[in-house]
Amino acid sequence: MTTNLEPGRPAAGVLLYWLPLGAGGHFVRWNGRLYEAVTARRRHRPAADLYHSALEVLIDADRHVIEMAPVWATRAADRGVVVEGPVGLPWLGRFAAFRYEVRRWRAGVIPDLAEAVDGPHLVGDDAARARRLLELVPQAPPVTWGRDELRTGDMWNSNSLIAWLLACSGHDMRTVGPPARGRAPGWQAGLVLAARRQEGRRSCPQRHAGPDAQLVQRVEWR
Protein backbone atom coordinates (compact mmCIF):
# COMPACT_ATOMS: atom_id res chain seq x y z
CA MET A 1 0.00 0.00 0.00
CA THR A 2 1.31 3.47 -0.83
CA THR A 3 1.54 6.00 1.98
CA ASN A 4 2.53 9.65 2.08
CA LEU A 5 5.80 10.18 3.88
CA GLU A 6 6.06 12.05 7.14
CA PRO A 7 9.18 14.19 7.71
CA GLY A 8 12.22 11.91 7.64
CA ARG A 9 12.89 9.12 5.17
CA PRO A 10 13.33 5.35 5.56
CA ALA A 11 16.75 3.70 5.34
CA ALA A 12 15.44 1.77 2.33
CA GLY A 13 12.44 2.58 0.24
CA VAL A 14 10.88 3.19 -3.14
CA LEU A 15 9.23 6.59 -3.45
CA LEU A 16 6.73 7.32 -6.22
CA TYR A 17 6.09 10.85 -7.49
CA TRP A 18 3.13 11.96 -9.59
CA LEU A 19 3.94 15.02 -11.69
CA PRO A 20 1.26 16.84 -13.71
CA LEU A 21 1.86 16.15 -17.39
CA GLY A 22 3.80 19.05 -18.86
CA ALA A 23 4.94 20.40 -15.49
CA GLY A 24 7.21 23.32 -16.28
CA GLY A 25 6.27 23.39 -19.98
CA HIS A 26 3.10 24.93 -21.43
CA PHE A 27 3.40 23.20 -24.83
CA VAL A 28 3.31 19.66 -23.42
CA ARG A 29 0.65 20.60 -20.88
CA TRP A 30 -1.78 22.03 -23.43
CA ASN A 31 -1.19 19.20 -25.90
CA GLY A 32 -1.84 16.73 -23.09
CA ARG A 33 -5.10 18.44 -22.23
CA LEU A 34 -6.17 18.38 -25.87
CA TYR A 35 -5.32 14.67 -26.11
CA GLU A 36 -7.28 13.90 -22.94
CA ALA A 37 -10.27 15.97 -24.05
CA VAL A 38 -10.46 14.08 -27.34
CA THR A 39 -9.95 10.69 -25.65
CA ALA A 40 -12.56 11.42 -22.98
CA ARG A 41 -15.09 12.49 -25.59
CA ARG A 42 -14.55 9.32 -27.61
CA ARG A 43 -14.97 7.15 -24.52
CA HIS A 44 -17.93 9.12 -23.16
CA ARG A 45 -16.34 9.97 -19.82
CA PRO A 46 -15.23 13.16 -18.04
CA ALA A 47 -11.74 14.44 -18.84
CA ALA A 48 -9.14 13.66 -16.17
CA ASP A 49 -5.90 15.27 -15.05
CA LEU A 50 -2.92 13.55 -16.70
CA TYR A 51 0.19 12.53 -14.77
CA HIS A 52 3.77 11.49 -15.44
CA SER A 53 5.51 9.31 -12.84
CA ALA A 54 9.06 9.01 -11.53
CA LEU A 55 10.79 7.09 -8.75
CA GLU A 56 13.35 7.72 -6.06
CA VAL A 57 15.05 4.59 -4.68
CA LEU A 58 16.77 4.76 -1.29
CA ILE A 59 19.16 2.10 -0.01
CA ASP A 60 21.16 3.13 3.05
CA ALA A 61 23.16 6.22 2.01
CA ASP A 62 22.51 5.78 -1.71
CA ARG A 63 19.73 7.53 -3.58
CA HIS A 64 18.83 6.91 -7.23
CA VAL A 65 16.32 8.70 -9.44
CA ILE A 66 14.49 6.55 -12.01
CA GLU A 67 12.81 8.41 -14.85
CA MET A 68 12.13 8.35 -18.59
CA ALA A 69 12.73 11.68 -20.32
CA PRO A 70 13.78 13.20 -23.66
CA VAL A 71 17.52 12.88 -24.29
CA TRP A 72 17.77 16.66 -24.63
CA ALA A 73 15.92 17.49 -21.40
CA THR A 74 19.05 18.03 -19.29
CA ARG A 75 22.70 18.90 -19.93
CA ALA A 76 24.05 16.88 -17.00
CA ALA A 77 26.85 14.67 -18.35
CA ASP A 78 26.62 11.81 -15.85
CA ARG A 79 22.89 11.21 -15.50
CA GLY A 80 22.84 7.41 -15.39
CA VAL A 81 21.41 6.68 -18.84
CA VAL A 82 20.95 2.91 -19.30
CA VAL A 83 18.32 2.63 -22.07
CA GLU A 84 17.42 4.72 -25.11
CA GLY A 85 14.45 4.38 -27.43
CA PRO A 86 12.62 6.20 -30.24
CA VAL A 87 9.66 8.55 -29.94
CA GLY A 88 6.66 8.32 -32.25
CA LEU A 89 8.13 6.14 -35.01
CA PRO A 90 11.07 3.69 -34.80
CA TRP A 91 13.12 5.36 -37.55
CA LEU A 92 12.86 8.78 -35.90
CA GLY A 93 15.12 7.54 -33.12
CA ARG A 94 18.17 8.35 -35.22
CA PHE A 95 17.49 12.00 -34.38
CA ALA A 96 18.07 13.20 -30.81
CA ALA A 97 14.89 15.29 -30.91
CA PHE A 98 12.89 12.05 -31.23
CA ARG A 99 14.69 9.90 -28.69
CA TYR A 100 14.02 9.20 -25.02
CA GLU A 101 16.32 7.89 -22.33
CA VAL A 102 15.79 5.87 -19.17
CA ARG A 103 17.87 7.12 -16.27
CA ARG A 104 19.11 5.30 -13.19
CA TRP A 105 20.77 8.38 -11.81
CA ARG A 106 22.70 8.19 -8.55
CA ALA A 107 22.01 11.33 -6.49
CA GLY A 108 20.05 12.62 -9.49
CA VAL A 109 17.31 15.20 -9.74
CA ILE A 110 13.69 15.04 -10.91
CA PRO A 111 12.79 18.21 -12.85
CA ASP A 112 9.77 20.09 -11.49
CA LEU A 113 9.69 17.92 -8.37
CA ALA A 114 8.08 20.81 -6.51
CA GLU A 115 4.95 20.29 -8.64
CA ALA A 116 4.50 16.65 -7.55
CA VAL A 117 0.97 16.06 -6.28
CA ASP A 118 0.62 14.92 -2.65
CA GLY A 119 4.39 14.62 -2.25
CA PRO A 120 6.27 11.30 -2.37
CA HIS A 121 4.32 8.07 -1.92
CA LEU A 122 6.17 5.26 -0.16
CA VAL A 123 5.44 2.18 -2.28
CA GLY A 124 7.65 -0.15 -0.23
CA ASP A 125 10.49 -0.14 2.29
CA ASP A 126 11.99 -3.56 1.59
CA ALA A 127 15.69 -3.26 0.71
CA ALA A 128 15.73 -6.45 -1.39
CA ARG A 129 12.86 -5.22 -3.58
CA ALA A 130 14.50 -1.82 -3.91
CA ARG A 131 17.74 -3.45 -5.11
CA ARG A 132 15.83 -5.67 -7.50
CA LEU A 133 14.14 -2.61 -8.98
CA LEU A 134 17.51 -0.94 -9.58
CA GLU A 135 18.80 -4.10 -11.27
CA LEU A 136 15.80 -4.17 -13.60
CA VAL A 137 16.16 -0.63 -14.96
CA PRO A 138 18.73 -1.47 -17.70
CA GLN A 139 16.47 -4.31 -18.86
CA ALA A 140 13.50 -2.08 -19.69
CA PRO A 141 12.36 -2.71 -23.28
CA PRO A 142 13.57 0.10 -25.61
CA VAL A 143 10.34 0.18 -27.57
CA THR A 144 8.81 3.19 -29.30
CA TRP A 145 7.34 5.83 -27.00
CA GLY A 146 3.67 6.57 -27.67
CA ARG A 147 2.96 3.31 -29.51
CA ASP A 148 1.73 -0.16 -28.54
CA GLU A 149 4.43 -2.32 -30.15
CA LEU A 150 4.13 -4.91 -27.37
CA ARG A 151 0.37 -5.32 -27.88
CA THR A 152 -0.59 -4.54 -24.31
CA GLY A 153 -3.63 -2.45 -25.18
CA ASP A 154 -1.93 0.75 -24.02
CA MET A 155 0.90 2.91 -25.33
CA TRP A 156 4.44 2.71 -23.95
CA ASN A 157 5.74 5.75 -22.08
CA SER A 158 7.24 6.86 -18.77
CA ASN A 159 4.27 5.54 -16.78
CA SER A 160 4.66 2.14 -18.45
CA LEU A 161 8.29 2.01 -17.34
CA ILE A 162 7.48 2.88 -13.72
CA ALA A 163 4.59 0.40 -13.48
CA TRP A 164 6.74 -2.34 -15.06
CA LEU A 165 9.61 -1.75 -12.63
CA LEU A 166 7.39 -1.68 -9.55
CA ALA A 167 5.46 -4.80 -10.53
CA CYS A 168 8.49 -6.79 -11.68
CA SER A 169 10.36 -6.01 -8.47
CA GLY A 170 7.57 -7.51 -6.38
CA HIS A 171 5.72 -4.46 -5.09
CA ASP A 172 2.00 -4.69 -4.37
CA MET A 173 0.34 -2.78 -7.20
CA ARG A 174 -3.26 -3.14 -6.04
CA THR A 175 -3.31 0.27 -4.35
CA VAL A 176 -0.79 2.10 -6.54
CA GLY A 177 -2.24 4.59 -8.98
CA PRO A 178 -2.50 8.26 -9.90
CA PRO A 179 -4.10 10.89 -7.63
CA ALA A 180 -7.87 11.25 -7.39
CA ARG A 181 -9.53 12.36 -10.63
CA GLY A 182 -6.26 11.67 -12.41
CA ARG A 183 -5.11 9.32 -15.13
CA ALA A 184 -1.69 7.92 -16.03
CA PRO A 185 -1.68 6.94 -19.74
CA GLY A 186 0.60 3.98 -20.35
CA TRP A 187 0.39 2.62 -16.79
CA GLN A 188 -1.59 -0.41 -17.89
CA ALA A 189 1.05 -1.31 -20.50
CA GLY A 190 3.62 -1.74 -17.75
CA LEU A 191 1.30 -3.88 -15.64
CA VAL A 192 0.38 -6.11 -18.58
CA LEU A 193 4.01 -6.62 -19.53
CA ALA A 194 4.91 -7.47 -15.93
CA ALA A 195 2.01 -9.93 -15.71
CA ARG A 196 3.39 -11.83 -18.68
CA ARG A 197 6.30 -12.87 -16.49
CA GLN A 198 3.89 -14.79 -14.31
CA GLU A 199 2.57 -16.49 -17.43
CA GLY A 200 6.02 -17.71 -18.40
CA ARG A 201 6.66 -15.18 -21.14
CA ARG A 202 9.84 -13.83 -19.51
CA SER A 203 8.88 -10.18 -19.87
CA CYS A 204 10.78 -9.44 -16.65
CA PRO A 205 14.29 -10.77 -17.39
CA GLN A 206 16.10 -12.69 -14.68
CA ARG A 207 19.66 -11.62 -15.45
CA HIS A 208 21.09 -9.05 -13.05
CA ALA A 209 22.88 -5.76 -13.64
CA GLY A 210 24.05 -3.98 -10.50
CA PRO A 211 23.29 -0.34 -9.73
CA ASP A 212 26.63 0.80 -11.17
CA ALA A 213 26.42 -1.00 -14.53
CA GLN A 214 27.27 1.40 -17.38
CA LEU A 215 25.91 -0.50 -20.39
CA VAL A 216 23.34 1.50 -22.35
CA GLN A 217 20.66 -0.52 -24.15
CA ARG A 218 19.69 1.00 -27.49
CA VAL A 219 17.62 -0.10 -30.44
CA GLU A 220 18.91 -0.03 -33.99
CA TRP A 221 17.17 2.92 -35.61
CA ARG A 222 15.42 1.58 -38.68
PLM features: residue spans?
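Non-catalytic ligand/cofactor/substrate-binding and regulatory segments of enzyme domains
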Residues: T2-R151
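Intrinsically disordered, low-structural-confidence terminal and linker regions
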Residues: T3, V219-W221
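Short helix-capping/linker segments at secondary-structure and domain boundaries
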Residues: D62, A167-T175
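Charged/polar, solvent-exposed surface patches and flexible loops
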Residues: R131-Q139, W164, P185, A189
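Surface-exposed patches in mature extracellular/periplasmic domains of secreted proteins
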Residues: W145-E149, M173-P178
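Active-site nucleophilic cysteine motif
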Residues: R147-S169
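Short terminal or interdomain "cap/linker" segment that borders an active site or interface and mediates
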Residues: P179-V219
